[in-house]
């Protein structure tokens, strides 16, 4: 049986490659470098060589970016992938290139019970809209709308670039520093991997005049040993992420649930105060009861994007 090639470039440092039969999950994925289009092409060739160059029915790629005029621009990688070139490289006609958050949303209906954990909220209503929030290098959003036959349609969004709002003097002080640095302050500036490090740095400048730069691994490590600034940075970050999930649920009418995914949550999941998250998620004044009924889930699988890509070949 012919196979399909699956590739996920949602991480800027490497990509995942896997083979699967149509409609089936890949058994294993392998990490390969992809810092340039030449390195991407070489990695694909090496991967296929290592698997005896199987017959390919088609291929699917997920990446952070968007398609324009037959090419997929990937700002995190700094290069553009052309459809015609990839078709020629693989000797195929059937090729899908989708946004990584869209591929995650496509996976939601295929997840096993063990791959989803409910973190807060009520029971919701079956058969209505769902939403997926993907927080990693960026902040992505997608809607999942069922048709009359129960088949999902994915609504791609760019909600991570929506304006950031604040609800406390502390949040406002962080916002002011980010505004001075960037001008426009989007939600992605705070509710992402880089955003967590930025929030930590802002708190240091506000409280101690500390201007040193840090990476997110340092912040998480400090939080694990009880560092007050790191703990507060995660608290602020989770609050803004909860607000993002809440606003998305309202705007999409996601009564069937909100699904949280991404590298940020993999890093700080055990440090999140889910009670505080729920309080921020449901704090919508007259619509608090409406929000309290919406379930919020955390996805727990390493290859969410690849699972989503398999749905394109059912």
Show where each model-derived region lies:
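Short beta-strand segments
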Residues: 8, 60-64, 98, 131-138, ...
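Short, acidic Gly/Pro/Ser/Thr-rich loop/turn segments
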Residues: 14, 66-68, 138-142, 198, ...
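Active-site nucleophile and cofactor-binding loops and adjacent substrate-binding regions
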Residues: 33-36, 76-77, 96-103, 122-125, ...
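Short beta-strand-loop/turn "lid" adjacent to the catalytic site in phosphate-handling enzymes
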Residues: 51-97, 102, 106-115, 132, ...
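ATP-dependent carbohydrate kinase catalytic cores
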Residues: 94-125, 217-231, 235
């Amino acid at each position: 049986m012919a196979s399909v090639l699956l590739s996920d470039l949602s991480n800027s440092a490497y990509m995942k490659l896997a083979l699967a039969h149509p409609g089936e999950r890949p058994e294993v994925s392998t990490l390969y470098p992809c810092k340039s289009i030449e390195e991407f092409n070489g990695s694909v060739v090496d991967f296929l060589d290592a698997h005896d160059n199987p017959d390919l029915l088609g291929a699917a790629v997920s990446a952070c970016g968007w398609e324009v005029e037959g090419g997929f621009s990937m700002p995190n990688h700094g290069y553009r992938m052309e459809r015609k070139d990839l078709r020629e490289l693989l000797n195929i006609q059937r090729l899908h290139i989708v946004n990584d958050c869209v591929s995650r949303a496509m996976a939601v209906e295929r997840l096993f019970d063990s791959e989803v954990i409910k973190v807060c909220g009520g029971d919701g209503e079956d058969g209505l809209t769902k939403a997926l929030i993907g927080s990693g290098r960026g902040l992505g959003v997608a809607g999942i709308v069922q048709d009359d036959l129960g088949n999902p349609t994915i609504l791609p969004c760019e909600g991570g670039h929506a304006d950031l709002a604040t609800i406390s003097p502390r949040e406002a002080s962080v916002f002011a520093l980010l505004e001075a640095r960037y001008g426009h302050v989007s939600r992605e500036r705070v509710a992402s991997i880089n955003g967590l490090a930025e929030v930590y740095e802002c708190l240091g400048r506000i409280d101690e005049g500390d201007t040193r730069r840090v990476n997110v691994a340092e912040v998480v490590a400090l939080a694990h040993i009880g560092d007050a600034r790191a703990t507060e940075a995660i608290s602020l970050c989770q609050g803004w992420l909860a607000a993002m999930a809440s606003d998305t649920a309202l705007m999409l009418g996601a009564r069937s649930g909100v699904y949280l995914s991404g590298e940020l949550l993999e890093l700080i999941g055990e440090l999140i105060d889910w009670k505080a998250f729920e309080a921020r998620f449901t704090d919508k004044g007259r619509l608090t009861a409406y929000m309290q009924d919406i379930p919020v889930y955390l996805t727990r699988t390493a290859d969410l994007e690849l699972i989503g890509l398999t749905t394109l070949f059912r």
